[in-house]
Amino acid sequence: MSQDNKGNGSKKRDFLGFTGLDAAKIIELFDYSLFIKQQRETNRNSDEFRPIRHKTVAMIFNKPSLRTRVSFELGVYELGGHAISLEGKSIGVGERESIEDIARLLSRYNDAIVARLHEHEIIETLAKHADIPVINALTDLSHPCQVLADAFTLYEKGLWRDDIKVVFVGDGNNVANSWIELAGILPFHFVLACPEGYLPDETLLKQARSNAKGTIEILHDPMEAAKQADVLYTDVWTSMGQEEEMAERLKAFAPFQINAKMVAEAKPSAVIMHCMPAHRGQEISAEVMDGPQSIIIDEAENRLHVQKALMVKLMNHDVYRKFHLTHRLHRAANRLKA
């Protein structure tokens, strides 16, 4: 998650994925996300908590966005900063100007870069040549901010534990890749149920399995995968840029819809998750999407809180570190009282 700045020996922290994080650091981020969420609920109109006051965040969007754009722009505003939205086509990432020059220039103007791109190599190049934090807001390879919010939602609801069984039903896409990457760090049981030919990134899978404290499975029978699941998770069957494959994908994924029959295979207490946008009647039935076990809107909301916590960690680490020092002192004091 961190890398050396060029020449000055100090640390620049990026968030391109879960590499460099351990379980303790992720739980710390979840605890700070809870604090951020509580701050918003109790002090929404207060000017007291503005840890990135007067800082600017350049936001590069090469892909359409609703949740990512709104949650990041609002998050920057609520933390006291200012977001500058840049459409990828207008600045010509890697075409009109080189990625290296864009990274160096934005580093002179801004305090962080948030990028939602197609090629993962572009965000890696941005991070390599920028002197400010770079956050991966989605690439074709991964979507770590989404999965961070997903796992936080389970943590917040008291559902996260070492033996939790999370079943991702659908395409081995960028969201599935990030779940696999997380499963290489946190000890839990992750199952990807996908058709043959729609597997996740082989390199990420191999690396996660070599590090995994829990279990990572790839199955091709969705009903078998769903048995005794604590979480049933899905995403669209046809992602941006795959529209020409839609007919073929609809046929391949037809048995992989999360519906009442599949939910019946999971634990009675199981929750339903979807990163959205959702296509009711395709990857998930309307009955399940809007049913009592769905926590889909909760996870969408939590994008805001987790990303705010992440930005404070990257842009004002002193505030982030002070919270955790205080948090540890409180816990120690409570243990002594007990």
Swiss-Prot record:
GO terms for biological process: arginine biosynthetic process via ornithine; citrulline biosynthetic process; L-arginine biosynthetic process. The keyword Transport does not apply. InterPro entries: Asp/Orn_carbamoyltranf_P-bd, Asp/Orn_carbamoylTrfase, Asp/Orn_carbamoylTrfase_sf, Asp_carbamoyltransf_Asp/Orn-bd, Orn/put_carbamltrans, OTCase_ArgI. L-ornithine binds at N174, D235, S239, M240. GO terms for molecular function: amino acid binding; ornithine carbamoyltransferase activity. It is an enzyme of class 2 (transferase). Carbamoyl phosphate binds at R116, H143, P144, C145, Q146, C275, R303. It catalyses: carbamoyl phosphate + L-ornithine = L-citrulline + phosphate + H(+). Pathway: Amino-acid biosynthesis; L-arginine biosynthesis; L-arginine from L-ornithine and carbamoyl phosphate: step 1/3. It is found in: Cytoplasm. Its EC number is 2.1.3.3. Keywords: Amino-acid biosynthesis, Arginine biosynthesis, Cytoplasm, Transferase. It comes from the Bacteria. Pfam families: OTCace (PF00185), OTCace_N (PF02729). GO terms for cellular component: cytoplasm. Reversibly catalyzes the transfer of the carbamoyl group from carbamoyl phosphate (CP) to the N(epsilon) atom of ornithine (ORN) to produce L-citrulline. Belongs to the aspartate/ornithine carbamoyltransferase superfamily. OTCase family. This is Ornithine carbamoyltransferase.
